[in-house]
């Protein structure tokens, strides 16, 4: 299970003291910028397709007027649009109010799950990619300039390959000629992954700074600043090539410390859906070397397993401790989060126990643990408190229509929403088939049925199990109106449940080959 974007940000933010923000622009420049006409195109349902068709490359932000992150992005987005309007060719930035009723079909079509969502449209919308770049103007500009050019650049001379030694990950295809299925597949993968890596291609392996110059071609060569430094693959199947790049571009053991050079690998580690094994201990104490040796040995022993490994310093990993519900006095500890969001913990682990404990995990012998606050003894407020240990009972098994908020205590938007939810819940208190609930997502594991990428996140769940991300208004009246319009009665819930069960009851048995 991948960790939500907001938590990944916190994990990394707590690992290093962030530098002070850049100096502000002078007032005269700011005034001049404010007076300039808006460079960001405003799109809506009536002009969206035409705009996408007119521009070979366009970045579109799907936003909501009430979204705090959208408001923070707006001036940076506009500044980037103004700077990129001078680029040759011009790079276009646009925005869509996805909260507007007439634009909601667009949000649905392009799978907008939260705000802001940014997508790159190429070639009239034939290619659509998530924007994975920075959120400040200068970063947006540099990122998009790279995205506009070819996905892979030809290396014609040794001087063209000097960038391969810059300490980043690069992928180079070595071919006898720039044609054929292998080259086509390579370019397809380069286009798909260009947001993450730099790609190059050449017919001269001897131009490259590392690797066998006499290698049989075609071959894909990945350069990296860790482990083997260079690794080759001859499998040009698109799926196999993507897997090769994914597996080779992360260290065998990701290090969680204050070194910012490790943060890109941490980001990729926590975004991965693969099972994750994490050893947390104090890097500055004597036993560290023996633990490190034992852990790296275990990584080699289980190298054939589908699991990613991390070793983290306690001091740098407080965000991870908070996310996983761990305590410093449990260290040294080893934790596994599997692809189904289950977690397995061994606290006070000894170096000599690591291999055996991992073997027990792979053999299915371990019992999962879950982060949960205690179930409230009294729960008499209009908005009901739910925790990980009772969320399924309250939300999915109560037979009621439930609006549930996932929040963080430190979140300003959550604090503003709290009295509004209280008011809405009080208004609906006499309607016994309705519950408004809240869960502190920093103290409880969020069930896998919900995708929580930021705070607050709200879902509406009906008695029949229908689950919808709530993207409606943020006033008490709007929330009440939404619930009353969308709730199921007992009869509707029974009918929906019966209808959902019909295919399973009538579908003939099939033999699976």
Curated annotation (Swiss-Prot):
Marked site (Lowers pKa of C-terminal Cys of second active site) residue numbers: 474
Annotated site (Lowers pKa of C-terminal Cys of first active site): 135
Top-level taxon: Eukaryota
Catalytic activity: Catalyzes the rearrangement of -S-S- bonds in proteins
CDD domains: PDI_a_family (cd02961), PDI_a_PDI_a'_C (cd02995), PDI_b'_family (cd02982), PDI_b_family (cd02981)
Entry-linked NCBIfam families: ER_PDI_fam, pdi_dom
Protein name per Swiss-Prot or TrEMBL: Protein disulfide-isomerase
Upper lineage: Eukaryota, Viridiplantae, Streptophyta, Embryophyta, Tracheophyta
């Amino acid at each position: 299970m991948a960790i939500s974007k907001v938590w990944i940000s916190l994990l990394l933010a707590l690992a290093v003291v962030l530098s002070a923000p850049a100096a502000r622009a002078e007032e005269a420049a700011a005034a001049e910028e404010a007076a300039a006409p808006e460079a960001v195109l405003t799109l809506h349902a009536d002009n969206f397709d035409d705009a996408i068709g007119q521009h070979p490359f366009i970045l579109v932000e799907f936003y909501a007027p009430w979204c705090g992150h959208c408001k923070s992005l707006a001036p940076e987005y506009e500044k980037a649009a103004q700077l990129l309007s001078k680029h040759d060719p011009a790079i276009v930035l646009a925005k869509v109010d996805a909260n507007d009723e007439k634009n909601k079909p667009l949000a649905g079509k392009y799978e907008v799950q939260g705000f802001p969502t940014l997508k790159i449209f190429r070639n009239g919308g034939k290619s659509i990619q998530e924007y994975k770049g920075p959120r400040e103007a200068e970063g947006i500009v540099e990122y998009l300039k790279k995205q506009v050019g070819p996905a892979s650049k030809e290396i014609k001379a040794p001087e063209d390959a000097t960038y391969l030694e810059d300490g980043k990950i690069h992928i180079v295809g070595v071919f006898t000629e720039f044609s054929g299925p292998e080259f086509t597949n390579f370019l397809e993968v380069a286009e798909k992954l260009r947001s993450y890596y730099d790609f190059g291609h050449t017919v001269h392996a001897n131009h490259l700074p590392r690797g066998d110059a006499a290698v049989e071609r075609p071959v894909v060569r990945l350069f990296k600043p860790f482990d083997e430094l260079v690794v080759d693959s001859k499998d040009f199947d698109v799926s196999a090539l993507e897997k090769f790049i994914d597996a080779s571009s992360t260290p065998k053991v990701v290090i969680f410390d204050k070194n910012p050079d490790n943060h890109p690998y941490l980001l990729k580690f926590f975004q991965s859906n693969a099972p994750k094994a994490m050893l947390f201990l104090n890097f500055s104490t004597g036993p560290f070397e023996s633990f490190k040796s034992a852990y790296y040995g275990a990584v080699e022993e289980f190298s054939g397993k589908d699991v990613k490994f991390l070793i983290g310093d306690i001091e740098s990993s407080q965000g991870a401790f908070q996310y996983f519900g761990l305590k410093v006095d449990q260290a040294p500890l080893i934790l596994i989060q599997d692809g189904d969001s289950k977690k397995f913990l061994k606290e006070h682990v000894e170096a000599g126990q690591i291999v055996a404990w991992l073997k027990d995990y792979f053999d299915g012998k371990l019992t999962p643990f879950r982060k949960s606050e205690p179930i409230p003894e009294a729960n008499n407020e209009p908005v009901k408190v739910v925790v990980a240990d009772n969320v399924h009972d309250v939300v999915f098994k109560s037979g009621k229509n439930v609006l549930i908020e996932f929040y963080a205590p430190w979140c300003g938007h959550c604090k503003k929403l709290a009295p509004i939810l209280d008011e809405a819940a009080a208004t609906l208190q006499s309607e016994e088939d309705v519950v408004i609930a809240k869960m502190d997502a920093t103290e409880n594991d969020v069930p896998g049925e919900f995708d929580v990428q930021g705070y607050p996140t709200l879902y509406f769940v009906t008695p029949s199990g229908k689950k919808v991300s709530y993207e409606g208004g943020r006033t008490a009246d709007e929330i009440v109106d939404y619930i009353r319009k969308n709730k199921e009665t007992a009869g509707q819930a029974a009918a929906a449940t019966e209808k959902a069960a019909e295919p399973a009851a009538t579908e003939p048995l099939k033999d699976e080959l």
